[in-house]
């Protein structure tokens, strides 16, 4: 029997995935209605920053300059550059292409982690699970209709976004355990806004 708290977390995860999945289509609609990728990013991060402020009071800065620079790198790679390249990709490529390519970010991250850290090797079980999850996501996105619509500029921008997310993941791995998640998230929003 699932406990109430577990149920709450599952609902929160489902809500998060739904919102994340809707961003590709909603961004495409906003671009079609004359908003630029930078404007979309600015609106998204400004709203997120304002929403997180009540939960992230207290500490304003990291404990040292090195950590503050890592937080700035996270805001740049996982904030402004990631979302700008993703939003720009949606100007040139269908949302289905962009979402599929961006969803390869965990694979790139796992590959790089296995090259950089000996203890981070992907097991066969994880590789099979990742492949099955990706195949399932492809089936959902394509909805049973496979139409190959290449858009080199958009597809390369989407791949750039996936690789930027890989960099962001590595930066967060280096700093993750030293600060509360809400502090890190607020700083990522802050530096993302600052570097737009």
Tell where the protein language model's regions lie, with residue ranges.
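Structural motif at transmembrane-helix junctions in multi-pass transporters
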Residues: 32-39, 84-104, 177-182
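Specific transmembrane alpha-helical segments of multi-pass solute transporters/efflux pumps
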Residues: 19, 23-24, 53-102, 137-139
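Loop-to-transmembrane alpha-helix entry segments
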Residues: 64-70, 99-102, 118-139, 148-155
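Hydrophobic transmembrane alpha-helices of multi-pass small-molecule transport proteins
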Residues: 52, 72, 104, 111-112, ...
């Amino acid at each position: 029997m699932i406990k109430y708290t577990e149920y709450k977390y599952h609902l929160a995860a489902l809500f998060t995935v739904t919102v994340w999945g809707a961003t590709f289509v909603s961004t495409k609609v906003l671009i079609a209605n004359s908003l630029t990728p930078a404007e979309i990013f600015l609106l998204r991060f400004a709203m997120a920053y304002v929403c997180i402020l009540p939960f992230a009071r207290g500490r304003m800065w990291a404990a040292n300059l090195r950590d503050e620079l890592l937080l700035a790198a996270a805001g740049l790679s996982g904030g402004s550059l990631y979302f700008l390249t993703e939003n720009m990709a949606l100007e040139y490529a269908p949302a289905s292409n962009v979402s599929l390519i961006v969803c390869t970010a965990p694979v790139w991250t796992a590959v790089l982690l296995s090259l950089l850290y000996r203890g981070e090797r992907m097991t066969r079980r994880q590789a099979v699970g990742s492949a099955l999850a990706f195949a399932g996501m492809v089936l959902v996105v394509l909805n049973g209709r496979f139409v190959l619509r290449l858009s080199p500029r958009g597809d390369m921008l989407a791949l750039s976004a996936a690789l930027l997310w890989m960099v962001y993941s590595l930066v967060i791995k280096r700093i993750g355990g030293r600060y509360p998640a809400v502090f890190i998230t607020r700083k990522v929003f802050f530096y993302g806004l600052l570097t737009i």
